[in-house]
């Protein structure tokens, strides 16, 4: 916020309060990222931990154990980090015993230890008032705002609260209060998780209160040698990335070495997997342009640099024929390369990809993505920009940007390709993750409240205060999937290109050895056909990323080229929104939904192959069942699929008119005869869904789920739904592209067993996509010419029929497993169909089995409901 000169003292007070978070892990007045802001105002800061390849459930269970129950409120303070690991031991001792205990060895505090430990009561006198309820944010808890410390429920006694950390240096640190102490009483009244908020809100006027604590000493904490110690909770070494050049240096190590990507003999053996050349077409007409402006790799053996004259000649010859070159295929040192030509502000840009890593269609889509990112990041790139770089004493910031950009693309290509064909990841649309309606409403409420920015609850001078920035729009992502967006589609495409080409999406979703705890990105951008200065802000917490575009308030006293650094207040507001979404269970729901394979269900290729082998013995039985269909009652699975509603976008698969017996059949059986609304049914939900609660079901439950009961009950009744016709599901893959909204809906996970099948399916999708794109281009050309030239009767003279639907039949052979037995290779036949729709504009690609004919129009109609959530 920006204030008038008369309100500067209150501004210092307001900013100091609003910026308190775990970013102040070293006890200073600066956030953990503030000292890494560059001279031009940009910021790239990340904290991550290296985690071993344990099960997903183990990692998620530890995460749930560390969370607190905020009753739907958003915490404005995140968990403290161990940022002082590189400091000396004397410095660690000077910060108090609480920080020293948290850095020596991991401890798990239990309420049962207080029964055996000697009582060590502590008291703390404070003057509190309920007027401080919102001084740390809109949804900060009452304990944080009024008392100044955070509390957590004990794992074995959720009703009792323990001290988890301190918001700032309150007097509690001077009285020996430390992490793990039992927050026992307030003015002699026992404090529990259910009554702490009501007790604190009663003090309307400033009142002196006495807080009672009981210490949890070294004997009270569970040590690693105790049998009750949870070994999954281990000390995590936090690593920092202070700027983007440092991120570029570590990106290959994080994504390939620690992510265990790369296949020996394929992508690693290629000496030059990616190359780039940027040069002006008139480089031989002027002496100062004899050499190319930039080429990567910056080595003399770069074949693009050595053959730049041939590329310029080809470009000049085709330009005289009123056409442009698109791609070339070269053979360099027995390695095939695909070279794509692109135009950028009068420059000729060449991208070369090794043919063993990706096909020609993939290279074309990748080149479109890269040139879009360069156009978005360098909108004013002209020849003079490079001439300024040659001046002595001037920093080569532009060439450093291009070098880092190319290094990231080379690592992305090596890590993500290695022979596996990609299709939906390379399209310009956003890969959406449609969550249930209740979750979508909560997300949009949180984003709308963040954009509203109502300061009246904690702003002392609202009349003399105005916003420093205006929020242009925001978008929420889970890994690389779009969860919700309040951005225009064309702007969102540019933002996602920024996230992909910077390697952020690959790091979040494709590096299992890396867990990103926090990330902050601040960079000035230029929006097309928009006035003013805009800044892209990206905040990441675990798997959730929130991208926000801010527009600065045009102050009269601000210079047009003034350096604008990151806004501490706005970054904290964005991070608070992320904390609120994580606490509401959005991250857990997105993780569950991305691997559920229910809406709609797709077949596993290996299961489909085994079904082919069993098909012949079961032909007679199936024919008998078809004849007796009117006599025999349908099975539970068939009846569940028939009762599933495809006529609406709600995630509920039941309608009010359905009877209770059908509802019981659709509800998973939990060992009791009660329905899904009973308490025992909800308690046994963890057994049926170990992905959310962890596979260690024998251990005692340490914390409640952050997902609300209504949201989990909403997805509890969800059954797998098929979009194909026939008795059984026959769909293996689908891609639903909504061109109007700029979104894409496809299966979320790729199994390693299905990689060969998916590569063939995506290759067929590339071929069909090229046919449909040519049809769309010719349709536009035909409509323009038909409007100019029409017959007297009003009909066009062109009678060429355009392609709306195109299909292919694939036969994939599988090699027998090397188990010592002689087995013959089997083959499976699939049908890949793509169709182009006009109103609304969309493309649909479906791969299904060839034994049952399908109607792609009907399948596209069913997919349209699931794409909305």
UniProtKB/Swiss-Prot annotation:
Keyword terms, alphabetized: Cell membrane, Cilium biogenesis/degradation, Cytoplasm, Developmental protein, Membrane
As recorded in Swiss-Prot or TrEMBL, the protein's gene is named in
What interactions and quaternary structure are annotated?
A: Interacts with mwh.
Q: Quote the biased-composition stretches of kind Basic residues, using this chain's numbering.
A: 70-80
Protein name per UniProt: Protein inturned
Following inactivation of the gene, the phenotype reported is: Abnormal wing hair polarity and in many wing cells forming two or more hairs instead of the normal single hair.
For region Disordered, the annotated ranges are: 1-28, 70-106
The job of this chain, per UniProt, is described as:
Plays a role in the definition of cell polarity via the planar cell polarity (PCP) cascade. Acts downstream of fuz and accumulates asymmetrically in wing cells to regulate planar polarity in the wing. Probably acts by regulating ciliogenesis.
Q: Where is the composition biased (Low complexity)?
A: 81-97
Q: Does the keyword Cell membrane apply?
A: yes
UniProt keyword Membrane present? yes
């Amino acid at each position: 916020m920006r204030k008038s000169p008369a309100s500067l003292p209150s501004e210092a007070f307001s900013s100091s309060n609003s910026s308190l978070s775990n970013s102040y892990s070293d006890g200073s007045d600066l956030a953990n990222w503030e000292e890494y802001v560059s001279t031009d105002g940009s910021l790239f800061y990340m904290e991550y931990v290296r985690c071993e390849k344990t099960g997903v459930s183990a990692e998620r269970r530890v995460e749930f154990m560390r969370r607190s129950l905020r009753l739907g409120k958003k915490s404005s303070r995140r968990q403290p980090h161990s940022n002082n690991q590189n400091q000396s031991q004397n410095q660690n001792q000077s910060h108090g015993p609480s920080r020293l205990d948290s850095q020596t060895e991991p401890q798990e505090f239990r309420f049962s230890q207080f029964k055996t430990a000697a009582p060590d009561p502590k008291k703390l006198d404070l003057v509190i008032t309920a007027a401080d309820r919102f001084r740390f944010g809109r949804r900060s808890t009452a304990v944080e705002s009024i008392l100044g410390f955070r509390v957590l429920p004990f794992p074995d006694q959720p009703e009792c609260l323990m001290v988890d950390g301190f918001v700032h240096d309150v007097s509690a640190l001077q009285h020996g209060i430390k992490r793990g102490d039992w927050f026992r009483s307030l003015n002699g009244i026992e404090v529990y998780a259910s009554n702490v908020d009501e007790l604190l809100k009663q003090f309307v006027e400033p009142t002196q209160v006495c807080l009672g604590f009981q210490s949890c000493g070294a004997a009270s904490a569970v040590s690693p040698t105790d049998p009750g110690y949870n070994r999954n909770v281990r000390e995590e070494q936090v690593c920092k990335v202070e700027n983007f050049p440092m991120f570029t240096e570590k990106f290959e190590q994080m994504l390939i070495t620690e992510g265990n990507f790369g296949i020996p003999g394929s992508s690693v053996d290629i000496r030059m997997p990616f190359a780039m050349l940027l040069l002006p077409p008139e480089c031989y007409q002027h002496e100062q342009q004899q050499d190319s402006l930039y080429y990567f790799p910056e080595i003399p053996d770069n074949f693009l640099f050595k053959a730049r004259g041939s590329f310029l000649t080809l470009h000049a010859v085709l330009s005289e024929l009123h056409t442009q070159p698109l791609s070339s295929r070269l053979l360099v040192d027995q390695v095939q390369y695909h070279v794509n030509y692109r135009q950028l502000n009068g420059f000729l840009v060449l991208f070369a990809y090794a043919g063993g890593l990706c096909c020609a269609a993939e290279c074309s889509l990748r080149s479109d993505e890269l040139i879009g990112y360069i156009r978005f990041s360098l909108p004013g790139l002209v020849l003079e920009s490079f001439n300024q770089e040659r001046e002595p004493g001037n920093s080569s910031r532009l060439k450093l940007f291009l070098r880092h950009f190319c290094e990231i693309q080379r690592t992305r290509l090596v890590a993500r390709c290695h022979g596996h064909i990609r299709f939906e990841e390379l399209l310009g649309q956003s890969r959406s993750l449609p969550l249930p309606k209740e979750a979508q409403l909560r997300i949009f409420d949180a984003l709308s409240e963040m954009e509203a920015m109502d300061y009246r609850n904690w702003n002392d001078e609202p009349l003399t205060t105005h916003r420093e920035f205006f929020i242009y729009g925001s978008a929420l992502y889970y890994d690389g999937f779009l969860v919700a967006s309040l951005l225009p589609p064309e702007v969102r495409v540019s933002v996602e290109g920024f996230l992909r080409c910077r390697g952020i999406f690959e790091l979040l979703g494709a590096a299992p050895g890396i867990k990103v705890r926090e990330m902050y990105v601040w960079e000035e951008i230029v929006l097309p056909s928009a006035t003013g200065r805009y800044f892209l802000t990206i905040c990441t917490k675990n798997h959730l990323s929130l991208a926000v575009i801010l527009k600065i308030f045009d102050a009269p006293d601000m210079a047009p080229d003034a350096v604008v650094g990151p806004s501490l207040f706005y970054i904290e507001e964005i991070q608070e929104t992320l904390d609120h979404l994580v606490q509401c269970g959005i991250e857990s729901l997105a993780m569950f939904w991305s691997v559920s394979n229910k809406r709609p269900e797709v077949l596993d290729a290996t299961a489909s192959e085994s079904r082919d082998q069993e098909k012949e013995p079961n032909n007679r039985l199936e024919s008998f069942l078809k004849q007796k269909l009117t006599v025999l009652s349908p099975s539970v699975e068939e009846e569940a699929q028939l009762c599933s509603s495809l006529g609406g976008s709600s995630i509920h698969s039941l309608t009010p008119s359905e009877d209770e017996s059908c509802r019981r059949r659709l509800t998973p059986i939990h060992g009791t005869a009660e329905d899904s609304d009973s308490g025992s049914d909800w308690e046994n939900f963890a057994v049926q869904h170990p992905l959310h609660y962890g596979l260690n079901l024998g251990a005692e439950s340490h914390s409640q789920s952050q997902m609300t009961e209504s949201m989990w009950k909403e997805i509890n009744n969800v059954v797998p739904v098929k979009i194909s016709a026939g008795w059984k599901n026959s769909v293996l893959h689908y891609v639903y592209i909504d061109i109007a909204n700029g979104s894409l809906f496809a299966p979320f996970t790729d199994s390693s067993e299905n990689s060969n099948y998916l590569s063939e399916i995506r290759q067929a999708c590339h071929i069909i996509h090229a046919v449909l794109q040519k049809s769309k281009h010719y349709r536009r050309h035909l409509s323009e010419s038909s409007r100019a030239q029409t017959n007297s009767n009003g009909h066009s003279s062109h009678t060429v029929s355009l392609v709306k639907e195109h299909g292919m039949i694939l036969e994939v052979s599988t090699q027998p497993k090397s188990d010592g037995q002689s087995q013959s290779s089997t083959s499976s036949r699939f049908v890949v169909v793509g169709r182009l729709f006009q109103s609304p504009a969309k493309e649909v690609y479906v791969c299904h089995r060839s034994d049952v004919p399908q109607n792609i129009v009907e399948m596209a109609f069913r997919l349209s409901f699931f794409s909305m959530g």
